[in-house]
């Protein structure tokens, strides 16, 4: 007798000895019932029920055990295992398949987890009483279009914020009356919004931007009903939910700022009041005045240290080296002109990329050169110098000149060189460009007070031209020259 294949052998081994076709089984049940109804009726209910269900609708056969049995038969034929070991291998394989490779087990677990989540969510919604509101909101959103012509991201973000408002805020209700859907809240007074008309009003405003040069009547664009909806939804939006550059984004930003400044956190105040009462402070007026002082008064803080980025440090060192080289080439040139010459030599792309930092740095250099030339020269030559605290805010102080009696001499070592105590001839013309400002920084405390000194310094700074103003004036002159016709004298005269 030829050896059977493992698959055929498994099929023969898995057949039941008393298996009968479905027709015979159904006929047997019906004939038993017809011939002797009492015999079948006297059997237990579960036995009769299983027999009827199996006869009418047989259960689905599972070929897993046949496949496992075929594998075991193949192992036995290949002499990988002995015949007496086949039963143990078959049982172990069935257990492993049922534990790790059962799609039914995995799907049942997934369904169980999903059912638990839905039950928890339903319980939470029932406790808040907002299940009907969410159902009504979903019905309203189903009437809205899924896409809009402009501002799709703003449209989706606003709808998500509305859904979050209704799901998280208590004392909110969404209901339908006739063809309209309404949103009602009673948290701070009863307020009702017609959602249908509000979204009809907003349908043409998603993604619309306005220009400051073209003013428009904003009251004509939105109805009071729509503005109330924006006010209620505003706390649940931000600049990423609705673009802040759009018309609706500007309104939502204004509403958020207004609500943030106007409303107080009652929970925080009640907690502070409870703590104060626990410590023996029962005076509510004193507590309120203390809180108002803590909230309204701003303590004076010291300016923070300036931490430069690697790019800013590179720009600072480059400008220091450029000023030092320019001073070495022209040692008798004035400080403001040397700084302007350094700025004029900068590459336009380099200046535009670091314009803010360069402007602040050159302004500090201008002040240092005017008030203390020796300090200015020291920071230019110091390769480890960094701006002082308050550099960006302007809240800093420059070191004063130690010897105010020394005169500045432009004819010797330059405008910012170390002052020399030499007597200047009064008959020679004074070439010092800061001569008119010396009196403002003299030691004559009896004649001029500190207020006049600062006023003189402000006037001095106001009359000076920055490097940007000089560049703009130069561009205007070049444009004026280019607008004229250089060949006008060659044209024929009529």
Curated annotation (Swiss-Prot):
Pro-sequence positions in this chain?
Answer: 484-494
Superkingdom is Viruses
Primary residence: virion
Induction (UniProt): Expressed in the late phase of the viral replicative cycle.
Q: Which chain positions carry the site (Cleavage)?
A: 483-484
Q: Summarize what the UniProt record says about post-translational modification.
A: Cleaved near the C-terminus by the viral protease during virion maturation to form the mature protein.
Provide the residue span(s) of the region labelled Binding to hexon-linking protein.
132-245
* Region described as Peripentonal hexon-tethering domain: spans on this chain: 1-101
The chain's coiled-coil residues are none
State any GO CC term: host cell nucleus
Q: What UniProt keywords apply to this chain's record, in alphabetical order?
A: Capsid decoration protein, Capsid protein, Host nucleus, Late protein, Phosphoprotein, Viral genome packaging, Viral release from host cell, Virion
InterPro entries, per the entry: Hex_IIIa, Hex_IIIa_N
Residues annotated as carrying Phosphoserine in the record are 439, 456
Function text: Structural component of the virion that acts as a cement protein on the capsid exterior which mediates the interactions between the hexons, including the peripentonal hexons, and reaches all the way to the penton vertices. Two hexon linking proteins IIIa, one from each facet, stabilize the unique edge interface between a pair of facets. As the virus enters the host cell, hexon linking proteins IIIa are shed concomitant with virion acidification in the endosome.
Any extra detail in the entry? All late proteins expressed from the major late promoter are produced by alternative splicing and alternative polyadenylation of the same gene giving rise to non-overlapping ORFs. A leader sequence is present in the N-terminus of all these mRNAs and is recognized by the viral shutoff protein to provide expression although conventional translation via ribosome scanning from the cap has been shut off in the host cell.
**Which family does the record assign?**
Belongs to the adenoviridae hexon-linking protein IIIa family.
Under what name is this protein listed?
Answer: Pre-hexon-linking protein IIIa
The organism named in the record is Murine adenovirus A serotype 1 (MAdV-1)
Q: What is the lineage of its organism?
A: Viruses, Varidnaviria, Bamfordvirae, Preplasmiviricota, Tectiliviricetes
């Amino acid at each position: 007798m030829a050896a059977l294949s493992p698959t055929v052998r498994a099929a023969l081994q898995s057949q039941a000895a008393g298996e009968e076709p479905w027709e015979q089984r159904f006929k047997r049940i019906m004939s038993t019932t017809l011939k002797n109804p009492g015999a079948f009726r006297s059997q237990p209910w579960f036995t009769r029920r299983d027999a009827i269900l199996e006869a009418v609708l047989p259960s689905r056969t599972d070929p897993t055990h046949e496949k496992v049995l075929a594998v075991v038969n193949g192992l036995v034929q290949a002499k990988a295992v002995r015949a007496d070991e086949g039963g143990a291998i078959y049982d172990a394989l069935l257990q492993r398949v049922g534990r790790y490779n059962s799609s039914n087990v995995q799907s049942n677990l997934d369904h169980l987890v999903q059912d638990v989540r839905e039950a928890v969510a339903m319980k939470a919604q029932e406790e808040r009483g907002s299940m009907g509101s969410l159902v009504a909101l979903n019905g309203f959103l189903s009437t809205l279009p899924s896409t809009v012509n402009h501002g799709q991201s703003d449209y989706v973000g606003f709808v998500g914020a509305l859904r979050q408002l209704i799901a998280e805020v208590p004392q909110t209700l969404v209901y339908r009356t006739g063809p309209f859907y309404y949103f009602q809240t009673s948290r701070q007074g009863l307020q009702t919004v017609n959602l249908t008309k509000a979204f009809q009003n907003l349908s043409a405003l998603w993604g619309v931007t306005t220009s400051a040069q073209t003013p428009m009547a904003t009251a004509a664009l939105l109805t009071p009903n729509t503005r109330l909806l924006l006010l209620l939804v505003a706390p649940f939006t931000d600049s990423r939910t609705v673009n802040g550059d759009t018309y609706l984004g500007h309104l939502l930003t204004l509403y958020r700022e207004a609500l943030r400044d106007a409303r107080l956190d009652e929970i925080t105040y009640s907690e502070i009041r409870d703590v104060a009462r626990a410590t023996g402070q029962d005076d509510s007026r004193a507590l309120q005045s203390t809180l108002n002082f803590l909230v309204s008064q701003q303590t004076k803080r010291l300016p923070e240290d300036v931490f430069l980025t690697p790019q800013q440090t590179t720009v600072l060192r480059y400008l220091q080296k450029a000023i030092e080289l320019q001073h070495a080439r022209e040692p008798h040139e004035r400080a403001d002109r040397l700084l302007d010459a350094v700025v004029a030599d900068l590459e336009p792309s380099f200046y535009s990329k670091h314009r803010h930092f360069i402007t602040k740095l050159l302004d500090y250099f201008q002040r240092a050169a005017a008030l203390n030339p020796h300090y200015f020269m020291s920071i230019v030559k110091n390769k480890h110098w960094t701006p002082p605290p308050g550099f960006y805010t302007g809240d800093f102080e420059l070191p004063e000149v130690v010897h105010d009696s020394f005169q500045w001499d432009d004819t010797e070592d330059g405008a910012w060189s170390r002052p020399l105590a030499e007597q200047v001839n009064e008959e020679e013309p004074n070439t010092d460009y800061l001569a008119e400002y010396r009196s403002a920084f003299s030691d004559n405390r009896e004649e001029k007070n500190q207020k006049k000194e600062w006023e003189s310094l402000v006037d001095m700074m106001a009359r000076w031209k920055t490097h940007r103003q000089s560049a703009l004036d130069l561009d205007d002159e070049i444009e004026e020259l280019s607008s004229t016709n250089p060949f006008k004298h060659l044209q024929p005269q009529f």
